[in-house]
Amino acid sequence: MSTEPYRPRRRARSFFVTARGLRQHLLEWGDPSLTRDDRPTLVMLHGWMDVAASFQFVVDAFAEDRHVVALDWRGFGASATPAADTYFFPEYVGDLELVLDELFGRARAPIDLLGHSMGGNVAMLYAGTRPDKVRRLVNLEGFGMPRSKPSHAPGRMARWLDELRTPMQLRPYPNVEAVADRLTKTNPLLRADRAAWLAGQWSGPTGNGDERALLADANHKRMSPLNAQVDDWLELYKRITAPLLWIEGDRSDVSVWWGNRYTKAEFHERLDVVADAQRHVVGPAGHMLHHDRPEDIAGLLEAFLSESRPPRIEPS
């Protein structure tokens, strides 16, 4: 049975900026003329092994046009790959700051900031570090990381040293259809037309016939030698002054990543330190909820971003 191809309702413009010595790729929907003080640019941050184009379905589902910018993180999509063989989390926060400088200047007005998964983690840290630069904050399943014990540090460092001896690799796919098949196998809730469209955004030709490779640096798979500093993250969460919208899928399962080391309940306790947080569950949806339920996400976003709330004073 044939499936009609997905056709974006709102076309994205592709462009690049140079920040921190790297050529960083962005997508833009709408026009800056659509912004106002109470309707600033919405900046979207994708997750690990994802790309900026992943937000296309949510942008298409908006009832009204708005100015949206999405960033390909370093080593993903069309952004440049750094020379280093290991990725450290603060690098993403630094990239966001300097990319925003390039887009809006250092004296910029507050933006609306959304992140999914890893991008949600970055968004939370950034909003706690630069609370005066974020008007509204949206986190789509950026659960953070499990607590690590200091006793884990020696073994973690040793495993990282061992990993450095072997180049990381991402397997190629015979064609773009195989990429789409992998997407639907990983996420059975993903519609076939969306999977086919995403496959063309997530992968690129290798030069070997129809073969495709994911647009991601394989070094993203290498572990960090450092324990997660959960208490540091929580201090930043406490400094978030923007209203926060948290959205999760009803079928997402954090045990897939961390077993019994970290639960949704523990993360929800962490959210309690954020002064102004709304929480929503959408479904049926898994971790890729922006693919599964883009219409629900768009509706929640538009309602949340249009709310009128007085700003909270930054804690001293």
Predicted feature residues:
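Conserved alpha/beta-hydrolase catalytic His-Asp/Glu region
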Residues: 169-227
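Conserved HGGG/HGGXW glycine-rich cap/lid loop of the alpha/beta-hydrolase fold
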Residues: 25-81
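Conserved loop-alpha-helix segment in the C-terminal half of the alpha/beta-hydrolase fold
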Residues: 241-285
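Conserved hydrolase catalytic core segment
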Residues: 109-152
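Catalytic histidine-centered segment of alpha/beta-hydrolase-like enzymes
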Residues: 282-294
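Conserved acidic catalytic loop of the alpha/beta-hydrolase fold
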Residues: 93-109
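Alpha/beta-hydrolase fold catalytic core
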Residues: 1-42, 63-66, 104-107, 161-162, ...
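A catalytic-pocket lid/entrance helix-loop region that shapes and gates access to the active site
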Residues: 140-173
